[in-house]
Structure formats: structure tokens, C-alpha cells
């Protein structure tokens, strides 16, 4: 459980004396302890590369998922097999949003470009992850086509609007890219998210959320699990077996 007290806190200060005060302050609440960086610049850089590394790793598995899709290989099966090795990092493909992982790499890239250096891997990762919403929508459309289901005027149910599972934060959520792509192809999209604040979603994204207890699975030609909230994992999808179900996070039991 990665909560504030259980994560080592990197601290620093503008002077050695202030750095010590800050470090002692955090030590009062951080059970895992603190790490006093030698300067604020080092502490800030450490935080930025932490999120950038995660962004790049997710971009790698996203690209692999797109490749395996073309090869007709189950990405989840490949990751499970590769995960038997002690040195394999267990990242999964998915949408990268929020106010940290999808933003911090741009800080680093901007500073690098100010100094005359063009970061290749960082920006390549951002390019891949920023395009995943459109990719997911097109995958759903292609799967519907294979079942002779027309996307124009079809009813699509998108499960989840927040940027990650089991949280209410909608900042920089890439699910909106999926919704817009589906709408651009003429679909009628319903969105359900029991974790999100319906008023906030309406005010910021102009989307009316469908209450989870009003979902009628058989009404939809396509169902897309965008965010793996715990409430969604208990949905009975047996009525949707003749429809298209796209599970971004490979969490649903649709056997």
C-alpha cells in the first residue's frame, strides 16, 4: 500500500540548515524514512525522472502491445511469460494521464531543449502514450467491424473517465480522447464512472455520467473498459457475449 507514510521521502533545502529542518519535519510523519538530497535541484530532478522513467516504460509496453496486436499474439500472455524472469519490469499497456506521469516528462524535455539538446526517448514515449486514446478507439471500431457491427449510430458504453483506477481525479484523463474518437466516427457514447464526481465531469468535460445501476449491458454494441475501477469488475457481461468487449487493462472476466 503506497501511502505517504510508507514511501521514502526525498528532502532538501536552500541551505544545509533549512535542509535539516525540512528533513526532520518529514521524519515525524514518514515511517519509511527520508533521503536528504544534496540540493533542491537534485531533489527536483529525482522526482522528474521518477515519473519520466515510468512514462517511458509504459510507452514501451504500449508499443509492444500494438506490435503484438498486428502479429496476432496475446499481449497479456506475453507479459505473464516474460514476468517469470527476475529482472523483467512488470509494466502493463494502458492510458497515461493525470498531473504527474504525463506532465513531468515535458518539464524535462523543455529544459533540455532550452540547453540545445533534443531528448529522443522522452519525447518518443510521450508521442506513443498521447496517441493511445485514439488507438484504443480504433481498435474497438475494427473489432466491431469484424462482427459486422456498424459504428455509425451505434451505442457504445465506456467504463471509466478518471485517469486511473479507484480514484476520482479526471485531470488529463486520456479516456476523453477515446470518447471523442468514437463520436467522430458517429457513435453514441455513454460513460459510466462511479468514482468520478458527476458535477465536475459535466462542468469540465461536458459529459453526463450514467449511474452504474442504470447500465443495461444488452443495449450496447460495444463495451470498453477504460479504467479498471473495482465496481466494474463485478459487472455481469454474459449478456454482451455477442457484442464487442474491449478491456484496456485486461481485468475483466469475460470467459
Q: Model regions: which residues?
A:
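Structural/interface elements that position substrates and couple domains in central-metabolism enzymes
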Residues: 1-255
Amino acid at each position: 500500500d503506497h501511502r505517504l507514510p510508507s514511501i521514502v521521502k526525498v528532502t532538501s533545502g536552500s541551505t544545509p540548515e533549512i535542509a535539516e529542518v525540512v528533513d526532520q519535519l518529514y521524519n515525524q510523519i514518514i515511517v519509511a524514512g527520508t533521503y536528504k538530497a544534496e540540493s533542491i535541484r537534485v531533489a527536483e530532478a529525482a522526482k522528474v525522472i521518477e515519473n519520466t522513467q515510468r512514462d517511458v516504460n509504459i510507452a514501451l509496453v504500449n508499443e509492444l502491445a500494438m506490435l503484438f496486436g498486428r502479429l496476432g499474439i496475446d499481449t497479456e500472455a506475453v507479459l505473464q511469460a516474460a514476468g517469470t524472469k527476475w529482472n523483467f519490469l512488470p509494466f502493463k499497456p494502458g492510458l497515461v494521464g493525470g498531473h504527474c506521469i504525463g506532465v513531468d516528462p515535458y518539464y524535462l524535455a523543455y529544459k533540455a531543449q532550452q540547453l540545445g539538446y533534443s531528448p529522443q526517448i522522452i519525447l518518443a514515449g510521450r508521442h506513443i502514450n498521447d496517441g493511445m486514446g485514439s488507438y484504443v478507439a480504433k481498435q474497438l471500431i475494427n473489432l466491431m467491424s469484424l462482427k459486422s457491427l456498424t459504428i455509425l449510430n451505434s451505442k457504445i458504453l465506456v467504463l471509466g473517465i478518471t485517469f486511473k483506477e479507484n480514484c476520482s481525479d479526471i485531470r488529463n484523463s486520456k479516456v476523453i480522447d477515446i470518447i471523442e474518437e468514437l463520436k467522430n466516427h458517429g457513435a453514441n457514447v455513454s460513460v459510466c464512472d462511479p468514482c468520478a464526481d458527476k458535477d465536475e465531469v459535466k462542468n469540465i468535460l461536458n459529459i453526463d455520467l450514467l449511474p452504474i445501476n442504470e447500465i443495461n449491458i444488452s443495449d450496447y454494441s460495444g463495451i470498453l473498459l477504460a479504467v479498471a475501477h473495482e465496481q466494474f469488475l463485478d459487472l455481469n457481461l454474459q449478456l454482451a457475449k455477442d457484442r464487442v468487449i474491449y478491456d484496456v487493462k485486461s481485468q475483466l472476466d469475460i470467459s
